[in-house]
């Protein structure tokens, strides 16, 4: 009998639910290294065994926040297990999301190029 595969839509739904639940759970974590953290996105492997969790932080050092989140990953996994109604709750792997920083840098470079072009004209 062929193995039943989950639909890509279900993968997205579960990733979104994990993102919402983690956002709530992080407010309850008492580690001072975790300041104002925003979960930007969650990417799941097809077998739901692993989840890449991308975050940004408004306060504090991103590296310290990453260490604190990695330290809290086991607790967060257990809390997700209580909330989610799926057979396998993924192992959480946190990654600092540099997308916003890159966008700001690109915007700065564009502004700089436009200013140089205006000076030349």
From Swiss-Prot:
GO terms for cellular component: cytosol. Keywords: Cytoplasm, Ribosome biogenesis. It comes from the Bacteria. Pfam families: RBFA. Gene3D superfamilies: 3.30.300.20. Its main location: cytoplasm. InterPro entries: KH_dom-like_a/b, RbfA, RbfA_dom_sf. One of its GO terms (molecular function) is ribosomal small subunit binding. One of its GO terms (biological process) is maturation of SSU-rRNA. SUPFAM superfamilies: Ribosome-binding factor A, RbfA. It is found in: Cytoplasm. Monomer. Binds 30S ribosomal subunits, but not 50S ribosomal subunits or 70S ribosomes. Belongs to the RbfA family. NCBIfam families: rbfA. One of several proteins that assist in the late maturation steps of the functional core of the 30S ribosomal subunit. Associates with free 30S ribosomal subunits (but not with 30S subunits that are part of 70S ribosomes or polysomes). Required for efficient processing of 16S rRNA. May interact with the 5'-terminal helix region of 16S rRNA. This is Ribosome-binding factor A. It comes from Paraburkholderia xenovorans (strain LB400).
């Amino acid at each position: 009998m062929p193995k039943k595969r989950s639909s890509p839509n279900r993968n997205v739904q579960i990733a979104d639910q994990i993102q919402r639940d983690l956002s709530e759970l992080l407010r309850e974590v008492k580690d001072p290294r975790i300041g104002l953290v925003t979960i930007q996105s969650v990417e799941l492997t097809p077998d739901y065994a692993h989840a890449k969790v991308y975050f940004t932080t408004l306060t504090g050092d991103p590296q310290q926040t990453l260490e604190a989140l990695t330290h809290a990953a086991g607790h967060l996994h257990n809390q997700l297990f209580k909330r989610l109604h799926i057979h396998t709750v993924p192992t959480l792997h946190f990654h600092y999301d540099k997308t916003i920083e890159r966008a700001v840098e690109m915007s700065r470079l564009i502004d700089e190029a436009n200013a140089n072009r205006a000076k030349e004209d």
